[in-house]
Amino acid sequence: MRTQVMQCCCLTAVALFLFCSMPLLAQRQDILLNNNWKFRFSHQVQKGSEVRVDLPHTWNAQDALSGKIDYKRGIGNYEKKLFIRPEWQGKRLFLRFEGANSIADVFINRRHIGEHRGGYGAFVFEITGEVDYGKENSIWVRVNNGEQLDVMPLVGDFNFYGGIYRDVHLLITDEVCISPLNYASPGIRLIQDSVSRQYAKVRAVVDLANGNNAGQEAELSIRLLDGEKVVAEQKQKLSLAGKSSVQQELTFEINNPHLWNGRQDPFLYRAEVSLWKGGQLADCVTQPLGLRYYRIDPDKGFFLNGKHLPLQGVCRHQDRSEVGNALRPQHHEEDAALMLEMGVNAVRLAHYPQATYFYNLMDKNGIIVWAEIPFIGPGGYDDKGFVDLPSFRANGKEQLKELIRQHYNHPSICVWGLFNELLESGDNPVEYIKELNELAHQEDATRPTTSASNQMGELNFITDAIAWNRYDGWYGGTPADLGRWLDAMHRDHPEIRIAISEYGAGASIYHQQDSLVKTVPTSWWHPENWQTYYHIENWKTISSRPYVWGSFVWNMFDFGAAHRTEGDRPGVNDKGLVTFDRKVRKDAFYFYKANWNKQEPMLYLAGKRNIMRSQQLQTIIAFTNQPEAELFVNGKSWGKVKADPYAILEWKNVELQPGENEIKVVSGNKKIPLVDSFHCRF
């Protein structure tokens, strides 16, 4: 009898889970509206000038990516016809845009319903009272990526692609629902008040809305699920006044929680929040919950769940060749896979909020995230990143609220970034940064703030941690300068938490040289071997200083920058470890893979694209995470060499023969034989 009861309980729990997880049964529908839009520029007013496009879409996939400095920055119009079913009357309808750059005005049946100013956050408008039920309706979106003085960012060393470049959704809910209108957040904020290995206390703050004129009696419940097992559950009855929006809190506790532990164990609970009305399920939203605790020590660096974790990171711009910023899921997945292959455990998503899909991938794979707003200074260019206008200040605060509220529940996010390379001249941003820092703490008391600086000044002492963009050995100086600078900074300011937010050098896979000669960064010659040398020397410096809480290679991927005229082509910043099309991993990628990815045995010969050698005596370099390897040149052994502490193998004065040569390296591990080779001519 007991077995039957247990089986019945299990079946009931599974049925309830399925009931709450299926959008139709849960009274919430999420309909993707990406297909069959008509697009035209603002000057194309003649009928028939539209072209059919599917979203995500940018109108700069050709001009900006070809290095055209004056790529189109203006107004594009998107229109879609949508049949609104008669049975949706009595429901609530919302349009959710994941991203449109940078100003979007939305019209329903040619009536203006709202404007969003900012190109990287999601936004939601309710259209319940604007549509005609049982008829075809028009959705018209006017997008403007032109320069504005009151919308962040004002400047940037990257392309400002125009368009609706992320997904668009139609959300259909009951009149009583978990509201999507709180800065386009999921309507649930999971606040980790206390987390340890023994105990966790979490508050769920839920945004509720009643669209009916009459008051409603309801019940709010939350279940924390580990697979299909209910770990914690809370319920609360409530009364919602007519036409009201309220926040409700539910608190739950967990003993001996399973922690989210980065790459080692990125475990996620599911927090399932349900709203019941008259005994019927009115709405249900599920969010990830990764329980973790962490700190940044000014002397010892970053600690996750009580254990030291050096953050071996990269920066990521969201664009790629041919598609610009209009990425599909497979593009995000490929980027994440390349990062995982290299052994990355942290990423700075620069210089703006990126797609929710990518944050989800970081949660699932245990990669720690630095997320930031697009408050960007001019860097090495003659421009301004801050204007002291009330409208600009307000826009920055709105974008910060969007970032935090939309992405609060992602356990991968551990720091909020507030600015990049600002100047304390002209309109001085220091007081405004203090306001942003205070706002970030008001919005989220659980995460520290940080920023990326490139100069000394008061702005470096505002956020909880600070990082610097350093290019020692690329934009002047030598790689050895980084160590001297870090040590002096730590000595003079032992209280601050120091990271390296950017370091990198340009490289073309088509530019090869025998000798190691530093180039001019702004020239058309970006030899790959200098990038490799740069990263080897900089990583030696960073990895030997535990007080550096994180370091972020600039950049994981080449990215579009239409104004750049350097490297092997205009319009591309080639500091990536992987090419713009994601097809080629540069030599420096494999250097980091050998150092950071100890799980996947690897052996790689550097310089294999240098197929025309000018000198008979060569230095052959390989990277491996194995103890040693043996070099063969034209079948002759040049001996076994043990890998140094930085996973480097080096054979000096290796003699080539005139004509064709085969260079081959073989791992000494017989259980896992590894071989890499290439051919070159002398």
Locate each region found by the language model.
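Secreted/periplasmic carbohydrate-active enzymes, especially glycoside hydrolases
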Residues: 1-18, 24-351, 361, 366-369, ...
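Substrate-binding/catalytic cleft of secreted carbohydrate-active enzymes
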Residues: 333-339, 346-584, 588-592, 602-614, ...
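Long, contiguous interaction/targeting segments characteristic
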Residues: 100-175, 519-592, 597
